[in-house]
């Protein structure tokens, strides 16, 4: 508890600081206060059985370790004799408390040893064991833990005290952290003695006098004094004289002036104290002196004692012991324990390295990263990350057993090893350049040449399998390939079937007996029953690109200059030859006249019962090969357009 109403009096001096304020600081912790805070959050049996209070302590410690905040646990020793009444009252022993209040100094020099077997004492032992595994030493105080913390702070052996007892200032503490909240947006509640002196005008002696007047763990206070009255009295006397005034003349309560004396009051105090006097209390039995001495000369370890020197040194992190403790208390696997604590330990090592570089820079020494005798904990930066909107880096670690990579704040990496960031950004820039480097574009003729080579390879394989039937197909493909090199607007579409063939006229049937050059394609012998030879056509033929996906002009006999015909190579071999009217040879030559349309995608209609011979096997083979060819050409067309 401390001094009654003191936290309210000091409210104007309270500061809410970010958790980062504790970075690189050494702080003493009143362990009893921390455990009481965590245990009071939930008093259910399940809470105590699952040791949730100990888990909360673990997570609070790991958050502070990541900031390189060095902690020192301090526990209570024996109960001071002046505090026995308060202690028994807290335990609910009213009768003992009443007797103790009647005779406050009946045993002034005897302290009461604490019950080491109580539930709370067992909680303290568990916390001390957990702290030792995390590298946090513990100092067992002679009496009050807050008095020992204040003594270390007063001697500059630490940067502050964690305690919720307001009487830490009375023992000499300069900086007191009352509460701490971890996590995103974490902060700490801080009180500075310097602020109290400047803002309120209260020094250490003034605060001790407030304890005498208002009451504390050591006394019940003086009747008639409230916070406002006590503060007015202390301010009116001054910090240097207030204790002597209390010891020599006692204290008397006063009230605000009313009536005829109100016009002469100074700072709400009546200059004629006798006229406004409420009560007078003399220190006849030395009660005030005992309380004052308890605060001015507390029983605690001296700064140069062996116990203090032992805990002020460095203590290692004991990973195997921590894994065992967490498995025993929390039922955690070693891997889960490592997942919680190792990233924080690594971050602490990086902060220590950053602090080393900052100290060197302050001395005017700015060595390169490779010249520092202590190796940098960061091996390399893996990638950039964003955590709660803050810039962070995922880094790989050097010499951190059990930890490969973790995420650390970006500002920490910048202060500890900016060279690693430069190295990472340069590497990232090179990777982007390689990705942006475009492949050299091939010229149009080179692209067509590649297409032609692929077509030739495919058609050679097809010709080897199907013989002379696909010779004509190869000629078609060569014609199409040549067409790609000519800048024309016509498009070759092999994906749509040709329209149905019209019925052949007698003149067309007669013309089939002649040898004709069909679309510039030589049709060699396709089957043993029929053969075709190529001759130059006497008619003029237009060298135009042929659209295989749309029907050609009507193939009437009067067609001028007729276009190059498309041959349906799937049925050419099945036409029987017609004998020439003037010839008496054995095997006539079947030929195709001008303007005749021969479909590549569908079987040709019957030219005549006498001239058609079905070869089912050849049709199946050709259809399959033609389909493959169309699919390949379609893929090339999609790539080009």
UniProtKB/Swiss-Prot annotation:
Chain segments carrying region Disordered: 428-448, 572-615
Chain spans, region XPG-I domain: 132-217
Tissue: Highly expressed in shoot apical meristem (SAM) and young leaves. Expressed in roots, flag leaf and panicles.
Region named XPG-N domain: 2-97
Function comment: Single-stranded DNA endonuclease activity in vitro. May not be active as double-stranded DNA endonuclease. Endonuclease which cleaves flap structures at the junction between single-stranded DNA and double-stranded DNA with a specific cleavage site in the 5' overhang strand exactly one nucleotide 3' of the branch point.
Name assigned to this protein: Single-strand DNA endonuclease 1
Localization: Nucleus
Residues annotated as binding Mg(2+) 2: 165, 167, 217
Alphabetical UniProt keywords: DNA damage, DNA repair, Endonuclease, Hydrolase, Magnesium, Metal-binding, Nuclease, Nucleus
Co-factor remark: Binds 2 magnesium ions per subunit. They probably participate in the reaction catalyzed by the enzyme. May bind an additional third magnesium ion after substrate binding.
Chain residue ranges for the region called 5'-3' exonuclease domain: 217-350
Biological process (GO), any one: DNA repair
The organism's taxonomic lineage, starting at the top: Eukaryota, Viridiplantae, Streptophyta, Embryophyta, Tracheophyta
